[in-house]
Amino acid sequence: MLNARFLFSLLLLPSLLGAQPTKPVQKPAAPPTLDARQRPRHLTDEQLLDQVQRQTFRYFWNFGHPVSGMARERSNRSFDYGDEVVTTGGTGFGLMAIIVAAERGWITRAQAAARVSKIVNFLWKADMYHGAFPHWYDGATGHTIRFSLKDNGADIVETSFMYEGLLCARQYFTRDTPDEGNVRSKVLWLWEGVEWNWFTQGQNVLYWHWSPNNGWSMNHPLHGWNEALVTYVLAAGSPRYAIDKAVYDQGWATGPDYLNGKTYYDR
């Protein structure tokens, strides 16, 4: 079972190979042209936050891949990414936005559960590497799309961003319906399969990438301080493949931004 303290810590953080689609994949619609004259004016702080939150949700909801439900990389018109590229980390952010939308009544809970269920069904059959996801997938097939020349395998930071959303979805969808039950069971299966301690190479530090073609050639150890802190939190909380405390102490917390053993705030 998931550790309650671990989940609470996660919520406090700042911040196929499978069946082909039975019908042609829809091409994404071009983003609408915005007219500055139609922008809302004189918003209160609350209204502005509501607007930002709703528009964030709309990107992930309206522009999700039609087969997988996953979040697209930018608008897919930038840098010639192509229409099928979806991103794991961005999908984790999108899952959180979908939960918010359901809670605020912008969509029904059933609609939210159906979309999240589609996403976990896709991930359940997609390419994985020692339980970790790649940065990019083909949203129709579940095959890995390389992010860079040697980055065509596991990306444990993007995997972590994905699990921030997946684990929160598992805690949110608690009702006895087919979609909500599917989310809980498959997220647990996926989560328990990530071999976090394997990504240390037997050392006291986590490594960002691994590729079946290129091995550890990216050679990118994760040292703090940056957005990858969540990777160490998740790796420490793994029910099956947890890292030792020394991996955090000697890997993450040795970065130049840590003032270990020194007083820097005395009130």
Label each PLM-derived region with a short phrase.
Residues R5-S15:
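Bacterial N-terminal signal peptides
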Residues M1-N3:
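N-terminal secretory signal peptides that target proteins for export/translocation
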Residues Q20-R267:
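Ser/Thr/Asn(+Pro)-rich, low-complexity disordered segments
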